[in-house]
Amino acid sequence: SAQNPDLAHSVTTEGTTAILNHAVRNGIERFVYFSTAHVYGAPLVGNFTETSPTNPVHPYATTHLEAELAVDAAHDLGEILGIRVRLSNGFGRPMTYEAADWRTLTSDLFRQAVLEKRMEMRTDGLQERNFITKTDIARAVRHLIELPQTQVGNGLFNLGGSQSQSLLAMATTIQERAQSKYSTEIPLHRPEPTTADIQHLNFDIHKLLNTGF
C-alpha cells in the first residue's frame, strides 16, 4: 500500500464501500469490517482504547480508517448493523504456503526456523506488540455475528490478545517450540539494542470482553 496508495484506496476504501452498499441494498442485517490497530498511529506505543484518537500515518491505516467511516455512517443511519474491528497482530498456520504473508514477524521467523534452522531478527526486538491467534480471531467473528444488537453499541471494538509482549519474547517462544520439535539447536540472532528501554503497548480489549467474548 505504501508503494501504491491509489490502489490501496481503490481496494480498501472504495471496495469496502461498494460491498457495504450492496449489503444495504439487499437487506443484509449485519456487516463486520476488519480494520487495523494501526489507525491509532505508528509505532504503537502507549495505551489504546476505542476512544483513543486516531492518527494513521501509512496508506494501509488511512484507507482502513476511511472504510471504517463508511461502515460507521451506515450504522448511524440505521441502514445496517455495522461492526468495526480494530485488529492487532494475528498469527497462525496459513491455509497454504502460497497464501501466507511471510513478511510478518511470526511467519518470517517460523519459516526461517523450519527451512534454515536459524532465526534472524531485523530489529533488537524490544518493541512490544499485541498478538492474537487466528483461532481466536475466528472465534471473535462468530461472537460478533451472534452478538445481541443491544450489546453492539457504536459497533467499534479492539481485538487482540490479553496482553502485549516484546518481539524478542515472541521470537524466543518460536525458537523454543522449533528446537523442541526438531530436537536441534536453532540460534536466534538480532541487532544489538541501542537502549534498554522497552516500548510498552497496552492494547485494551475490555470493551469486547465485557460483551462475553
Give, region by region, the residue ranges found by the protein language model.
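Flexible, glycine-rich beta-alpha linker
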Residues: Y40-G41, H58-P59, R86-T104
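Active-site Tyr-X1-5-Lys
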Residues: A42, N55-S88, A113-L115
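C-terminal substrate-binding subdomain of Rossmann-fold SDR/epimerase-dehydratase oxidoreductases
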Residues: E116-K117, M121-F213
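Conserved cofactor-binding/catalytic machinery of classical short-chain dehydrogenase/reductase
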Residues: L7, G15-A18, R30, S52, ...
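Conserved Rossmann-fold NAD(P)-dependent oxidoreductase catalytic core, especially the SDR/UDP-sugar
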Residues: T17-P59
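Hydrophobic positions on the long internal alpha-helix
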Residues: G15, I19-A23, A67-V71, A140, ...
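NAD(P)H-binding glycine-rich loop region in Rossmannoid oxidoreductase-like domains
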Residues: S1-V11
